[in-house]
From Swiss-Prot:
Subunit annotation: Monomer.
Protein's gene: unc-104
Organism of derivation: Anopheles gambiae (African malaria mosquito)
Stated role: Required for presynaptic maturation, has a role in axonal transport of dense-core vesicles carrying synaptic vesicle precursors, components required for the morphological transformation of axonal growth cones to mature boutons.
Location of the region described as Disordered in the Swiss-Prot/TrEMBL record: 391-412, 952-984
Subcellular location: Cytoplasm, Cytoskeleton
GO MF annotation, one: plus-end-directed microtubule motor activity
One CC-aspect GO term: microtubule associated complex
Keyword Membrane listed: no
InterPro entries reported in the protein's UniProt record: FHA_dom, Kinesin-like, Kinesin-like_KIF1-typ, Kinesin_assoc, Kinesin_motor_CS, Kinesin_motor_dom, Kinesin_motor_dom_sf, P-loop_NTPase
Binding site for ATP: G97, Q98, T99, G100, A101, G102, K103, S104
Disulfide bonds, paired cysteine numbers: none
Superkingdom assignment: Eukaryota
Protein name as catalogued: Kinesin-like protein unc-104
Alphabetical list of Gene3D superfamilies matching this protein: 2.60.200.20, 6.10.250.2520, Kinesin motor domain, Pleckstrin-homology domain (PH domain)/Phosphotyrosine-binding domain (PTB)
Length: 1644
């Protein structure tokens, strides 16, 4: 084993470094190389770094005595490596360093004597030693190959047939090798010299055509050296084979130092990939060598990451003697690159190679290859494939299964491996004479190719290398890389010499290729020794930097540039000789000789830029001046802005100071009052300073508003969740690290009847909010319990669940931290703490009871007032509103004659006192039949605009169908109690717990406990009953007699309050295994209209340009508009156009669809906005389109800050479209969407089966007269298929319907409501208060967070989930109360009313029931032109309604409306009174819609069957709107409307629009409150939307007679009118009922 020999060589300064006056930072002393950091002060510890290598060559200054020449480098490294090759070892020498560091000079050198590099010198010395030592017993053979690695592609430089890229294979015996790479036999150094020259020519041609240079490619020159020695004594022939690999690496590129851009930047990236991989390999090998002992697991070395390291695998740490020459620059401007090179070289010293003598390699290799070929033939024969040898030696493969489309992958691999092995064995069996013959053939082919290209050749046919003709004019190539310059020479013969490409119709004498070279580019005319260049039309030809269009006479030394990359120097030997002899002082033809500059490639390029008007220095100075001016301008703007801000802050400070002074003056006035003054009648609130003249109605409204404000608490709950999330994360992290089986998560708890809070979780009331002992506030109302944030502790070890307050969490967290710090002091033999976990000593655990709460039930006692017995079947409900079973309870009064009978099943008796003082101390919250809207503690459950009178009306009429029952029973309850409830007497009643049913089998030992709400300490309990789980009822049959002295408080309790029943059971199974299953089996699903949509309406994606979204304004809504938006995702088609991707509308849901995309294709997102024309809404342009929230589930993540996939798309300007025949406003814009920039695997890969991808896009649009951008947000779902996959649906439904043939069907619709609010500078105080910023600590890092595997504390979504639970509890409570009242009413015989229900009441009730099935209820008031009385007259005669009937009719009307009526109907009113207006606040600014039609003298309407319409007819149109077009600033709000999935009616209608050309048959779908118009029933895209909430519907016989079209009715919106005709007479009423149920009922 031997280490890699490492040498470092420093070159002289180049012209660039001299021009920049660089300083030398390299010093060498012996084998030590020192580098000085120019950025660090001299003398510091980090200023100088020292490295020791095997050799350090000082080649900086030739005048130095220690200057190292090429010969010295070769004598130290080359001779040693050559000796190793004669010994039979593999040898490798490679040069490493940055671009321009001198690698190519060290390896190749120059043609002058003494300037040869390592490669020519080692080849020359090789053949010298061969000639000296060759004899009859010792024979030598040498073969060479020359390849180039560019951008991970391998090219053969010696064989012109191998024009393409060669494959790199790996053989188990040979290792990595290049397939079909030419290995040419050579017999002398001159042969190698010529092959190197030929290879450089091929490299030059390819580099010129591809615009490359050698510094961007790796060159590998390999010599295969074979020694055959004949042993005369044994007559045995031994063979040694060594491989000499000479590598010239590409320079390491730095984009900022080389100025690389575009393609050059990509080339540099590929070069750096190879060099980076080489560095990784060197580091890995050095690390392995530095280890003391070999690791058990083999270390991974990334050889395969690049072609270069793969081919050099044996030379790096393998079977090779390797030397590395690190070339460095001495300049300080290259400090970073030089230091990196030195570090790589230092690491390479540690690499250990295991070189062995390659003796008798061929014999062993041939034998093993033959065995491998035989095995492969047997394998193919077993597969039914025979390999036969043809007449020409070619292997022919015969397979009986040719008709199969494809064979197995194993068979194909075997055939491929067989062919590769046979190529190798044929190459090894080739004799030396055959190799020489093949080499000569390749040389002839190569010369022919060069001659065909026009490269000059000698008389013997050999191409010209470094040779200058004496007479003939010629062109010599110039290249950016000096090693490739002057390699190619092209003669210009007498007469015409054509130059072009090989594809020209006329054969070209000089053939070039590459960009901007025409088929016939130009012609050189050589006449009488004068060469004229004649360019063809549109050909790029430059002479001495000037573009040539007309014929140009060339002078010797002229620089000729053809196309973009081909640079030549024209030379005329005779002309140059004459000029020199005639006058040497004349500057001929702008040659640069006099100026001392060399006419190389750089000179030609600079000359081109200068002559074409591109002066680099002038451009740089101009750019510097522009930057300086920009800096001054920005500095002035910044200073001005700073001055304005300073003045603003000073003004704000003055205003605050003035405010403080005013407050201090006011408080000084109060200081004159004594404390006794405030306890007298002259209170501060009746002080003249605070006197307010409020009426009783205003005071009541203020009290209602104050109570409503107190019940809103979403913001405080969110603050608690955000502020304590970091504590929750830390507790979970400690729990995981200490291996505690406890998990903590936020939850919300509200003190309700079904979920009472323990005292430690009850939130403290606000200071001053409660009076009278904390029971009632100043308004005489009991406060609704506030919702509190708690921590749900899931103890999976003990199978229990606890709830902690936030304060308890912080206290326990301190103990957890202490336990965590003490954990390190415990030894492995420390005892387990299971005892502490059970006794409560461990801060992670709490004590848990044996029995667990199953649920609660409530039984009302109103039947005891009458007195009658009742048997109740009540639901057992848990804390989350889930029904866990049912309980049967009997409640009956015990009269005097029954008191003595205790033998009939009576188990227990008790006596309870209901005295007034005790009841006052334990007053329970008042339970209403239906809570008032102002007392409903579910935030957001009521309307702000509801009037106080309507709230008072709600107390008497809940609108839910139970008011009549409650009112009748309340009237009875308000009467004097019966004789059995006379105050002072004792009253006994009996509560019998009969049975429990439906309780899950997981609960064992069930028992029931009940008590009065205010007497928790006096509870009655049954005996436990075994729950077998068979489904049979659990019989308790527990009888409890209760005797109570009758008081007013007891009577009040019987009227309003229930008894609570608590059912307990021992939970015998582990909760984590059964809870989830139990929840899924028993939990009732919420009603359909309460469920969240499958794809929720997301909040806008945060824009990088606009920052966080501002708070929504609370100012007045000035106008509302309905907006229809179409979304399309377009993909690049083969014809170059962007075609909309297929959208699958198979789910038949409104505004829903699934985009079917292809992988790896360019896409664009196209959005079209459609709305009615209005002067208020004018789109200016699209400001930004943001795409983010990439996910595979419909709901986005709670934490938006962690979304790293947000991408702002490149925008195209928006445009206003004009659609023929449609006068609506259309605004469309597009954005380029490169989904790979999201760096999301979901968008990069093909979507898995059954999976869908969801994204959220937000478009920020600018409108006229709007202070903020309008934001359109939409969630899109998609599936990504393979690039060539067909995305069209394959179902028979779509096959026969042809739904997807129309490209306009491939779009997704969205319905939005645009609200324009008045812009406010400061906003209301509520807005300012809501703008406070609370830090969300859920994303703050906590030590150990990575162990949580992505777990996050719950956020805002928890509040909405809790709202649904509270809604369920409220409904269960209401249902239980109403069920009790109905049961009591039936028991009392109150169902037989004296006045039976009339037919009118039945019709109205049926109408209300049918209308309530629709999810949205809206009433469209009839037009004054169509009185209701006239339409109702034919249906039934008018009659006077009683008060009772009037109340019933009015309640049904409110049921249809779905909200409270706007105007209370008086007792004397009739059913045909004027209805209240339904206009929203946003509609107040709009003019009333005029539904009247044209006068009777208008032209008749044609029927829908007639095609041509009269020009004079006008459809029903709204009245002209008088808008104030003065400049007003608005704040736009675009909110997506979730369209109801319920279809009220769908079918074909004939539609006539205002201003339309005629009747059109359209498919119409009614999803209240919207009507969608489609082109046909197969059209999945909504083309138009009508909002029934703001429309007016009319249908009358007068209207039909006037338009002379039967079966018609009109729909008039704010902007246009529609006339609709049904296809049949019977459908008119059904359509009217679907659109306007009240109007249909009136006409009926």
């Amino acid at each position: 084993m031997s280490s890699v020999k490492v040498a470092v060589r420093v070159r002289p300064f180049n012209s660039r470094e001299i021009a920049r006056e660089s300083k030398c930072i390299i010093e060498m002393a012996g084998n030590t190389t020192c580098i000085t950091n120019p950025k660090v002060p001299p003398g510091s510890s980090e200023s100088v770094k020292r490295f020791n290598y095997d050799y350090s060559y000082w080649s900086h200054d030739p005048r130095d005595l220690e200057f190292s020449t090429q010969a010295m480098v070769y004598s130290d490294i080359g001779e040693e490596m050559l000796q190793h090759s004669f010994d039979g070892y593999n040898v490798c020498i490679f040069a490493y360093g940055q671009t321009g560091a001198g690698k190519s000079y060290t390896m190749m050198g120059k043609q002058e004597d003494g300037q040869e590099g390592v490669i020519p010198m080692i080849c020359k010395d090789l053949f010298r030693r061969i000639q000296e030592t060759e004899s009859d017993d010792l024979k030598y053979s040498v073969e060479v190959s020359y390849m180039e690695i560019y951008c991970e592609r391998v090219r053969d430089l010696l064989n012109p047939k191998n024009k393409g890229n060669l494959k790199v294979r790996e053989h188990p015996l040979l290792g990595p090798y290049v397939e079909d790479l030419s290995k040419l036999a050579v017999t002398s150094y001159q042969d190698i010299h010529d092959l190197i020259d030929e290879g450089n020519k091929a490299r030059t041609v390819a580099a010129t055509n591809m615009n490359e240079t050698s510094s961007r490619s790796h060159a590998v020159f390999t010599i295969f050296f074979t020694q055959k020695r004949q042993d005369r004594m044994t007559s045995l022939e031994t063979e040694k084979v060594s491989k000499i690999s000479l590598v010239d690496l590409a320079g390491s590129e730095r984009a900022d130092s080389t100025g690389a851009k575009g393609t050059r930047l990509k080339e540099g990236a590929n070069i750096n990939k190879s060099l980076t991989t080489l560095g990784k390999v060197i580091s890995a090998l050095a690390e392995i060598a530095s280890k003391n002992k070999k690791s058990k697991k083999a270390d991974f070395i990334p050889y395969r990451d690049s072609v270069l390291t793969w081919l050099l695998r044996e030379n790096l740490g393998g079977n090779s003697k390797t030397a590395m020459i690190a070339a460095i620059s001495p300049a300080d401007i290259n400090y970073d690159e030089t230091l990196s090179t030195l570090r790589y070289a230092d690491r390479a010293k540690q690499i250990v190679c295991k070189a062995v003598v390659n003796e008798d390699a061929n014999a062993k290799l041939i034998r093993e290859l033959k065995e491998e070929i035989q095995k492969l033939r047997e394998l193919l024969k077993a597969e039914g494939i025979e390999v036969q040898e043809g007449e020409d030696g070619e292997k022919k493969i015969h397979s009986p299964n040719r008709n199969r489309k494809r064979t197995g992958s194993s068979t194909e691999m075997a055939v491929d491996q067989l062919q590769a092995s046979e190529k190798l064995i044929a190459e090894l069996n080739e004799t030396w004479e055959e190799k020489l013959k093949r080499t000569e053939q390749i040389r002839v082919q190569r010369e022919a190719v060069f001659a065909e290209m026009g490269v000059a050749v000698k008389e013997d046919g050999i191409t010209v290398g470094v040779f200058s003709p004496k007479k003939s004019p010629h062109l010599v190539n110039l290249n950016e890389d000096p090693t490739l310059s002057e390699c190619l020479l092209y003669y210009i013969k007498d007469g015409l010499t054509r130059l072009g490409t090989s594809e020209a119709n006329v054969p070209q004498d000089i053939q070039l290729s590459g960009s901007h070279i025409l088929k016939e580019h130009c012609v050189f005319e050589n006449k009488d020794g004068v060469v004229t260049l004649v360019p063809h039309k549109d050909a790029l030809v430059y002479v001495n930097g000037r573009k040539v269009i007309e014929p140009e006479v060339l002078q010797t030394g002229s620089r000729v540039i053809l196309g973009r990359n081909h640079v030549f120097r024209f030379t005329h030997p005779e002309q140059a000789r004459e000029k020199r002899e005639k006058n040497k002082e004349v500057d001929v033809c702008e040659t640069p000789g006099n100026s001392g500059e060399i006419a190389d490639w750089n000179f030609a390029q600079c000359e081109l830029l200068e002559k074409q008007g591109i002066d680099l220095k002038a451009e740089m100075e101009k750019r510097l001046l522009a930057l300086e001016e920009q800096y001054k301008r920005e500095k002035r703007a910044a200073d001005q802005e700073f001055e304005e801000q300073r003045k603003t802050y000073e003004a704000r400070i003055d205003a605050l100071q003035k405010q403080v002074e005013e407050q201090s003056m006011t408080m000084s006035m109060y200081s004159s009052y004594s404390p006794e003054d405030f306890h007298q009648e002259e209170d501060i609130f009746v002080n003249p300073l605070f006197e307010s003249c409020w009426t009783a109605r205003e005071a009541g409204l203020a009290a209602w508003a104050f109570r409503k404000w107190r019940y809103h608490q979403f913001t405080s709950l969110r603050d608690d969740l955000w502020g304590n999330a970091i504590f929750l994360k830390e507790a979970n992290a400690i729990s995981v690290e200490l291996k505690k089986k406890v998990q903590f998560q936020f939850t919300l708890l509200t003190d309700t009847l079904y979920s009472p809070l323990p005292p430690e979780l009850t939130p403290a009331p606000a200071v001053g909010a409660l009076t009278n002992g904390g029971q009632e506030d100043e308004f005489g109302q009991n406060p609704i319990p506030r919702t509190t944030v708690a921590v749900e502790v899931t103890d999976t070890k003990n199978g229990a669940t606890h709830y902690w307050s936030l304060e308890k969490l912080r206290q326990r967290l301190e103990l957890m931290r202490e336990m965590y710090h003490n954990e390190a002091e415990l030894s492995p033999t420390s005892p387990d703490y299971n005892v502490e976990s059970l006794t409560g000593g461990d801060p992670f655990y709490d004590r848990f009871p044996w029995f667990r709460m199953v649920g609660r039930s409530f039984v009302y006692l109103s039947n005891l007032l009458y007195p009658v017995p009742l048997v109740h079947k009540v639901a057992i409900v848990n804390e989350r509103g889930d029904v866990r079973g049912y309980l049967r309870v009997a409640v009956q009064p015990v009269m005097d004659e029954e008191n003595a009978d205790f033998s009939n099943g009576v188990k227990q008796s008790a006596r309870i006192l209901f005295d007034e003082e005790q009841n006052g101390q334990h007053k329970v919250p008042k339970i209403r039949t239906i809570p008032d809207k102002d007392e409903k503690y579910i935030e957001g459950g009521n309307e702000m605009g509801t009037k106080l009178e309507e709230l008072e009306q709600e107390d008497a009429d809940s609108g839910r169908g139970d008011s009549s029952v409650a009112s009748e029973l309340h009237e009875s309850n308000d009467q004097e109690p019966g004789e059995h409830l006379q105050p002072g007497k004792e009253f006994t009643f009996r509560v019998t717990v009969l049975q429990a049913t439906g309780i899950a089998a997981e609960y064992a030992d069930i028992f029931c406990q009940f008590n009065f709400l205010h007497r928790h300490e006096e509870a009655f309990s049954t005996e436990p009953v075994k729950n077998s789980g068979s489904g049979a009822p659990l019989g308790f049959y527990h009888v409890q007699n209760i005797t109570v002295p009758v008081t007013k408080s007891f009577i009040e309790y019987l009227k309003t309050q229930p008894i609570v029943f608590k059912v307990f059971g021992h939970y015998q199974h582990h909760p984590l295994h059964k809870d989830a299953k139990q929840d899924c089996q028993i939990t009732r699903p919420p009603p359909r209209r309460m469920l969240p949509p499958s794809i929720p309406i997301s909040q806008p994606v945060r824009s990088p340009k606009f920052g966080p979204l501002p708070c929504p304004p609370s100012s007045t809504v000035l106008a509302k508009h309905d907006v229809l938006v179409w979304f399309e995702i377009c993909e690049l088609a083969p014809n170059g156009e962007y075609v909309p991707a297929v959208v699958d509308h198979s789910d038949d849901l409104p505004c829903r669809g699934l985009f079917l995309l292809h992988q790896g294709i360019q896409r664009r997102i196209r959005i079209t906005i459609v709305h009615e024309p209005t002067p208020e809404v004018k789109w200016k342009d699209i400001r930004e389109l943001v795409v983010g929230r990439i996910r595979n589930q419909p709901e986005p993540a709670d934490d938006e800050d962690s979304d790293s996939c947000v991408l702002s798309l490149g925008l195209f300007p928006g445009e206003v479209l004009e659609v023929p025949g449609d006068d609506r406003s259309f605004f469309r814009f597009e954005a380029a969407w490169d989904s790979s920039l999201h760096n999301s695997a979901l968008l990069n890969r093909v979507t898995q089966t059954g999976e869908q991808i969801y994204i959220t896009l937000s478009a920020y649009l600018e409108l006229d007269n709007c202070a903020r951008p309008a934001i359109i947000t939409k969630d899109l779902s998609m599936i990504i298929y393979g690039r060539d996959a067909r995305t069209g649906p394959r179902s028979l439904k779509h096959l026969f319907s042809g739904q997807y043939r129309n490209p306009e069907a491939n779009r997704l619709s969205g319905v939005y409501e645009l609200s324009l609010r008045r812009a406010s500078e400061a906003g209301s105080p509520g807005v300012q208060r809501r703008q406070r910023r609370v830090l969300d600590t859920s994303s703050t890092y906590v030590r150990g967070e990575e162990n949580l595997h992505g777990w996050r504390p719950r956020g805002d979504s928890l509040i909405f989930d809790h709202q649904w639970e509270l809604e369920k509890l409220t409904r269960l409570e209401e249902v239980g109360r109403v069920r009790h009242l109905l049961l009591l009413r039936e028991r009392l015989g109150m169902d037989t009313t004296p006045n039976p229900t009339t037919k009118t009441e039945k019709d109205v009730c049926n109408l209300a029931q049918r209308a309530s099935a629709s999810p949205v209820h809206m009433v469209i008031p009839p037009s004054p032109q169509t009185p209701v009385k006239d339409q109702q007259a034919p249906a039934m005669p008018e009659r006077e309604l009683s008060v009772r009937e009037t109340e019933l009719v009015w309640k049904c009307v409110k049921l249809i409306q779905g909200r409270i009526g706007c105007k209370e109907l008086g007792a004397e009113g009739n059913g045909s009174g004027t209805q209240a207006s339904d206009a929203s606040p946003g509609d107040e600014g709009c003019a009333d819609m005029n539904a009247s039609y044209i006068s009777s003298n208008s032209i008749e309407l044609c029927s829908p069957e007639r095609v041509d319409m009269p020009n004079g007819w006008e459809a029903p149109a709204p009245a002209p709107q008088t808008q104030d077009l003065s400049l007003r600033l608005y704040v736009p709000e675009l909110e997506e409307i979730r369209v109801s999935p319920v279809v009220a009616r769908k079918g074909y209608l004939n539609v006539l629009e205002h201003g339309g050309s005629g009747w059109k048959k359209r498919w119409v779908t009614v999803r209240r409150p919207y009507v969608f118009i489609f082109r046909s029933d197969k059209d999945p895209v909504e083309r138009a939307v009508l909002n029934l909430a703001t429309a007016q519907v009319e249908c009358s016989e007068d209207q039909a007679a006037m338009v002379k079209v039967p079966n018609t009715f009109s729909v008039v919106t704010k902007h246009r009118g529609y006339l609709l005709q049904t296809l049949g007479d019977k459908e008119v009423h059904d359509w009217l009922y679907a659109i306007n149920p009240l109007l249909a009922g009136q006409i009926r």
